[in-house]
Regions:
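Macromolecular interaction modules
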Residues: 1-157
Length: 157
């Protein structure tokens, strides 16, 4: 018997963060990469997270994106957060296990001086990968995706 879709599909949670107003972009990046990320990575791996990435979007990149958007007729909303954290896992139990880890609570407390608590943004969904390492993947010989149907995949975790 196959595992339920809630155990097979890869979930992606993103949390977009804004830095504290008195922290420079460079100091924020230095803190994230020099202090926070290595400790967080070990903690997340210990608790079953399959992937953990941090995406940085400094003002210079946001400005460039705004210019690109304007050149294309402004079809997009250009988000203005400083960094987005991505977590990949198979089920919400994995997320809850990590979130309830006492070490995670310590990690979150250390964020206080750097990350604004006023407005963070979160999203959760599933991942369908179609190109990996420059190669087309998960497409059958019939040219159709090999993923289960939307009705199965869209059952909330």
């Amino acid at each position: 018997m196959d595992e339920p879709i809630q155990k097979r599909r890869l979930l992606r949670m993103t949390v977009a963060h804004y830095r504290q107003p008195d922290v420079s972009e460079e100091d924020f990046h230095r803190w994230v990469t020099g202090q926070h990320a290595a400790y967080a990575a070990k903690l997340h791996a210990k608790n079953g997270i399959e992937g953990f990435s941090i995406y940085f979007a400094p003002k210079s990149f946001r400005d460039m994106t705004a210019q690109l958007n304007a050149q294309r007729g402004s079809p997009w909303v250009v988000r203005d957060y400083d960094a987005q954290v991505e977590f990949y896992f198979r089920d919400m139990e994995t997320f809850y296990r990590g979130a309830s880890d006492p070490e995670f609570q310590v990690l979150q407390a250390e964020e206080e001086g750097f990350i604004s608590r006023i407005h963070a943004e979160i999203s959760v969904g599933w991942v369908e990968t179609y190109v990996s390492d420059g190669k087309v993947v998960n497409i059958g010989d019939d040219g159709k995706p090999e993923y289960p149907a939307f009705a199965q995949l869209s059952v909330a975790p």
